[in-house]
C-alpha cells in the first residue's frame, strides 16, 4: 500500500502473513477502510486521496479452524518488535508496542516506510489494543461453541482466555474516541456476531427439544407393557448378543446428540432395541385389517351359496356363524354387507319382496321364505 506525501492514511489490511503476530476475527470478513486525511494542498490532492481511499479493499484470510485462528492470537515476537522500533522509532525510550508508539509508527509507515509485514503487525496490534477487543473475541468464540461437544467448548474457552491474556500483555490499551472509524468497526462486528450466535442457537435448541420429545415418546411406549422393558422373552430373543440385564442398565443412559453418527446409532440400538423388538412382536400378533382367516371365509362362502336367494342371516344365524368361525359379529356383518354389494343381485321375486313396503312381513313369512332356514336348527359344525 502506498500513500501520498501530504496525507496520513492507515488502511486496516487483514491479509498477509500470520506467523509474526496476532490475528483477530475480523480477518474473515470484508471491512471498511479506516482513513484519516490532512488537508494541505487544495482540492486536487484531496480528490487524489479520495480515489486512493476508494481503491483499498481488505482481503479475507481463511483459517483452517477456529482453534488455529485463536492460537495465532499471540504477542509479536521480539524480533518483530525490534524490526518495528528500528524502522520507525529507533530513539524512542517508551515500552515496545505501546498505544502511542503504534500511532507514531503508523504515521511513519503512511509516509513511505511501511512493508506488508510491518503494516500487518500494526493493524493487528491496534485492534488488540482496542477496548472492545475482548468483547469481539468472546462473541466470536460463542459462535464457535454453538453445537460443539463439551470438550471442544472447554478448549475454546481456554484458548479465548489465553488470547485475551496475550492481548493484555502487549501494553496499555487505547481509549474510545481516539480512532472513530475503528470504534465503529468494532461495535458493528460485535453486534453482528451476537446476532449470528442467536441465529445459530435457535435451530440447535429446537433440535434438542425435538430429540427430548421423541425420547419421552419412546419411554411412554416402552413402559406400557412389562415385556417392553427388556424383561420378556421377546427382548431376550431380540438381543442374542446381549442380556436383559444389560438392557435394564442402559435404560438410564443419556444419549448424547452431539456424538458421532455411528456412536449415536450404537447408543440408540443398545437403549431401545428391546423396546422395539417387543413392540414388533405385539404388532405381528395383530391380524391385518380387511383379511379374514381362510377357514372362516370358506364357511361364510358355504353359507352364502346355500342361501343365495336371500343372504340375510338372522341374529341367531350370526351367532352360530361367529361361534363356528371364531369371528365377532361385527366382522360377520361387514362381510355380508360387502358380499351383497359386490356379488348379489336379487331375483324378480326377491326384488318384489324388497320393494313391497306394505306387507313385507306377510310376504316374507308366508309365501316365499315360509320354511325356516336349516341353520336355525343345526349346530355351527354343520355349516
Curated annotation (Swiss-Prot):
DNA-binding region listed in the record: 284-347
Superkingdom, natural source: Eukaryota
GO terms assigned for molecular function: DNA binding; DNA-binding transcription factor activity, RNA polymerase II-specific; protein homodimerization activity; RNA binding
Localization per record: Nucleus
GO cellular component terms, semicolon-separated: endosome; microtubule cytoskeleton; nucleus; plasma membrane; plasmodesma
Pfam family of the protein (one): KNOX1
Keywords per UniProt: Developmental protein, DNA-binding, Homeobox, Nucleus
Domain ELK: 263-283
Region (Disordered): 37-58
The keyword Nucleus is annotated on this UniProt entry: yes
Cystine bridges: none
InterPro entries in the record: ELK_dom, HD, Homeobox_CS, Homeodomain-like_sf, KN_HD, KNOX1, KNOX2, TALE_homeobox
One GO-annotated biological process of the protein: carpel development
Function: Required for shoot apical meristem formation during embryogenesis. Probably binds to the DNA sequence 5'-TGAC-3'.
Family: Belongs to the TALE/KNOX homeobox family.
Official protein name in the record: Homeobox protein SHOOT MERISTEMLESS
Organism for this UniProt entry: Brassica oleracea (Wild cabbage)
Classification of source organism: Eukaryota, Viridiplantae, Streptophyta, Embryophyta, Tracheophyta
Gene that specifies this protein: STM
Amino acid at each position: 500500500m502506498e500513500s501520498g506525501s501530504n496525507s496520513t492514511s492507515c488502511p486496516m489490511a487483514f491479509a498477509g502473513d500470520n506467523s509474526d503476530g496476532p490475528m483477530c476475527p475480523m480477518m474473515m470478513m470484508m471491512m471498511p477502510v479506516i482513513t484519516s486525511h490532512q488537508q494541505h494542498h487544495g482540492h486536487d490532492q484531496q480528490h487524489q486521496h479520495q480515489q486512493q481511499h476508494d481503491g483499498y479493499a481488505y482481503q479475507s484470510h481463511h483459517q483452517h479452524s477456529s482453534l488455529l485462528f485463536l492460537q495465532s492470537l499471540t504477542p509479536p515476537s521480539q524480533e518483530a518488535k525490534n524490526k518495528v522500533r528500528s524502522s520507525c522509532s529507533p530513539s524512542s525510550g517508551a515500552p515496545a508496542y505501546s498505544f502511542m508508539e503504534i500511532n507514531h509508527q503508523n504515521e511513519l509507515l503512511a509516509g513511505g516506510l511501511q512493508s506488508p509485514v510491518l503494516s500487518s503487525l500494526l493493524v493487528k496490534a491496534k485492534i488488540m489494543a482496542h477496548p472492545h477487543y475482548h468483547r469481539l473475541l468472546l462473541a466470536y468464540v460463542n459462535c464457535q461453541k454453538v453445537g460443539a461437544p463439551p470438550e471442544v467448548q472447554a478448549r475454546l474457552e481456554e484458548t479465548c482466555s489465553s488470547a485475551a491474556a496475550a492481548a493484555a500483555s502487549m501494553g496499555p490499551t487505547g481509549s474510545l474516541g481516539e480512532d472513530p472509524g475503528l470504534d465503529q468497526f468494532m461495535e458493528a462486528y460485535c453486534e453482528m456476531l451476537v446476532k449470528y450466535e442467536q441465529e445459530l442457537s435457535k435451530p440447535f435448541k429446537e433440535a434438542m427439544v425435538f430429540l427430548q420429545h421423541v425420547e419421552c415418546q419412546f419411554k411412554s411406549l416402552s413402559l406400557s407393557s412389562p415385556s417392553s422393558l427388556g424383561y420378556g422373552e421377546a427382548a431376550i430373543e431380540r438381543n442374542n448378543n446381549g442380556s436383559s440385564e444389560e438392557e435394564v442398565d442402559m435404560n438410564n443412559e443419556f444419549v448424547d446428540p452431539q456424538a458421532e453418527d455411528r456412536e449415536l446409532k450404537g447408543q440408540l440400538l443398545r437403549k431401545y432395541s428391546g423396546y422395539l423388538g417387543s413392540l414388533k412382536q405385539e404388532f405381528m400378533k395383530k391380524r391385518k385389517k380387511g383379511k379374514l382367516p381362510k377357514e372362516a371365509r370358506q364357511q361364510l362362502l358355504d353359507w352364502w351359496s346355500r342361501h343365495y336367494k336371500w343372504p340375510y342371516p338372522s341374529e341367531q344365524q350370526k351367532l352360530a356363524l361367529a361361534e363356528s368361525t371364531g369371528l365377532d359379529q361385527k366382522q360377520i356383518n361387514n362381510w355380508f354387507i360387502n358380499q351383497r354389494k359386490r356379488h348379489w343381485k336379487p331375483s324378480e321375486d326377491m326384488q318384489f319382496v324388497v320393494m313391497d313396503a306394505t306387507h313385507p312381513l306377510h310376504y316374507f313369512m308366508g309365501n316365499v321364505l315360509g320354511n325356516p332356514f336349516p341353520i336355525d336348527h343345526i349346530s355351527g359344525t354343520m355349516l
